[in-house]
Amino acid sequence: NFGHPREDTCNIILLDEMNLSRPEQYFAEFLSALEKNNPEERLISLSETSLPNAPAMLTEGRKIRVPANVWFIGTANHDETTNELADKTYDRAHVMTLPKQDKRFTIKPFEPANYSYRSLRKAFGKARAERKEEVVKLLKDLTGDAFTEQLGSQFELGWGNRFEKQALDFIPVMLACGASSGEAVDHLLATRIMRPGKVTGRYNVSAETLRNLKGALEDFWISADLAGDPRKSMELLEADIRRLDGRS
């Protein structure tokens, strides 16, 4: 329903340095609500009981609905003053890592542009429809590959419904934006699977186990005919192999 202009506007709520406290506590209800497929069910309780003289748009006089056109973007630093984000936060978010920039770089100029929420959703839906068969096959190949078997047997990790849903949403849009399927899959693997606490950063696996996983990933890339290399995933694996080997 886009009956009012504000309903067709993309609204972004920016939460800076989210992990100075613990998002799993203060943001938990939002994490749960944002995963609801039905926007009408994305409700946040403001009170245990109905509020007197509550605003008309509150559900049951005590719940506020998070509209589909409201997106949350949070920043998180990783240092001694912050808390580590829990798996459930990472797993429900789209993660972008901003690496340290030691050298100056030139920002590409772009003309300002405005996009309505409706136009974005339409573009996302078009990309998903056009690329669905391709992405479903890719995920099927990944699920049946030796790489996935090693994740399960050596790391006790699997894909799950959430990963599949995110991949079906994310990969087609990346392809429509000009990225390769290799870049899209690499980003998902690096942020979902290879990050510390999942595959890397552990003490109950050996460097040899990581080398075997690295080889399996390379083999999958070739068999699936994915463009480029899984650069982000490889960098994480190689850094952790050096750690376990006692090298800096």
Which residues does each predicted region cover?
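C-terminal regulatory/interaction module of P-loop NTP-utilizing enzymes
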Residues: 1-248
